[in-house]
Amino acid sequence: MLAALLINILFIHSVHNAKILLASMPQGRSHTGSFMPLINKMKEQGHEISLYMEAYPDETNFGLKDRMLKIVNHTNPFATEEFESFQWKHDFVVTSQMFPFFYGSTSCDIVLREHRNFFNQMVNEHFDLILTDTLFAVCAYGFTALNKARANHVLMSSTHVESATGAMRAHGINFVLRPRQFMPVQDVEFKPELFHYRVTGTFEWIANFIISGFIVNERMKYSLAPVVPSFSFFEYQRTASSTFTDMPSDLIGPFPRTNDLFEYGAYCPTPKPLTGELLDFVSDPQSKGTILVAFGTVINWGRVPRKKFDAILDTLNSLTDYRIVWAYNGHPLNTKPHIFASSWIPQVDVLFDNRTVLFFSHGGLKSVKEATCSSTPAVFMPMFAEQVRNGWMAKDKGYAEVFSKHILTAENLRKTMKLVLENKSFSKNAARIANLFNDKVVHPLVQGAHYMNRLLRYGGRMPEYF
């Protein structure tokens, strides 16, 4: 009896003090930020969580134990002028997905060539569970596959489960009947009753599987060859114990799934009241409201093509009836007094301020969710990845418009922004969706942490019922 009691005490202690590693893509501030609400909930419950990321050379560790690999004398493979130019000139289609994986492989080449000791340290360190980004974290896949403690790994998706991952994991999702990950900006619609949408969905699903399972796999296999003789991305995904996704089905819609796919993303951030200079700025009694302009961590305003930048600047300068808060990291600006530009803006706090009437953004999932939570109508101008689909989710529910960067002129952008600002249906729909989004029996982060803890109770894997 006493022995059984001691075993139970040790078992509970191990669950509540687990060593967990979160391994994100290189310079992956955005992806890590998507994972952090769940990670912080796990920290609150007593778990020790470390963060691995290849940083060029610096990046925040988000308050986690530091396993950051700071790489000097190299530029971030994801921050090339070529990639930044691509974002403004081209659409991100299914074949574009391979290039970020190639960048992740290039980063891993550097790690294994110049930082092999650090890689080996990660191989040999004991963790109870390893959480790896589903995208671009090539070296993390390598040291997880080699981990001496044989820690089980979980796939962490910062968006909806990619169709290749869903197929490799056999999650039971019919991606032909789901909105396409790389929805074209010239057709921001999803009508599965029409043959055209089912055909294009089928093509994208097959293409994504081929690209991830064969083309990308060969590039990653080449990078990891010095340490993993025959790496298989298919096998790595297949053998994961579960998948966690930040995409709420409240936005993308319900879908069938297996019991090892968990979502935790239908949460809202906690805002703080505006203070100081920013509060004084938005409190102008003559203002019709605040417009927030923020395009995430990837867009460098100093490298935006001149004509497109001028179109945005001219549009913002013309909206003199509003106070405009712009998260801006480019060259010095010549703006009118109604524009407040700063390299850092408390985005959540501005969105939740009751004076904010419009959000102009790129349509990253965090931005779409923050617009949803704060009941803020939006104009989304997608730049890359799945951002067209993210914008579609808000457009489909009636509180946003999706604007194409290919028709970016001051006249076109101003017309779209005025439409959302002056049509009250956008704000009414935003308020309605926010109420539905927050109406949960169990808080999604509490539920997500429960499922993560259940994995730990069973040695990092799903319980076996049969």
Q: Model segments located where?
A:
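Cleavable N-terminal signal peptides of Sec/SRP-targeted secreted and luminal proteins
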Residues: 1-17
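Short beta->alpha connector loops at strand-helix junctions that form conserved
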Residues: 71-76, 157, 265-266, 362-363, ...
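C-terminal "capping" alpha-helix adjacent to the active site of nucleotide-linked donor transferases
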Residues: 408-425
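Nucleotide-sugar-dependent glycosyltransferase catalytic domains
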Residues: 27, 32, 37-322, 333-337, ...
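Nucleotide-activated donor-dependent transferases that construct or modify glycoconjugates
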Residues: 14-28
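A short acidic/histidine/glycine-rich donor-binding loop in glycosyltransferase catalytic cores
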Residues: 339-340, 378, 396-405
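A donor-sugar binding/catalytic signature common to diverse glycosyltransferases
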Residues: 130-132, 343-390
